Amino acid sequence: MKKIGLFFLVLLLVSCNSKVKKEDIPKLNGYWEINQVTFSTGDTKDYKINETIDYFELRQAQFDNKVVGFKQKVMPQFDGKFKTNNIKEAFKIIKKDNSFFIEYTTKFGKREEEIVELQDSIFTIKNKDNVSYTYKKFKPFLFK
């Protein structure tokens, strides 16, 4: 009986640790809002409403066929439009040790975040400080 229980525990752990696949990467396109931050201590902070959301846009680089893009902070408006400061943070998607990372490059330096989970309506990234950001797909305001 213990062996059966151990088998199901291992099966559960393996299924929960499904890695992000190359074909999942295009799901990153679009508007995303932070849903929860998990700090390295294990403490969490939930976000119910966000004044700003992140817009990700991906494309294939012409010179080396890598996935590149930018991230931009935008503020949703009640009319369905977005305000922005027009600052775009360039990035590329890189693969290391069977994991995908977003590598940002700005005039201030480079940083990277591991893509831990990427689905149609949710994704999680983790930075070098072991802080995880879980995003959910942004749903526009529906005021008419």
Protein language model regions, located:
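C-terminal motif of bacterial Sec signal peptides marking the signal peptidase cleavage site
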Residues: 12-15
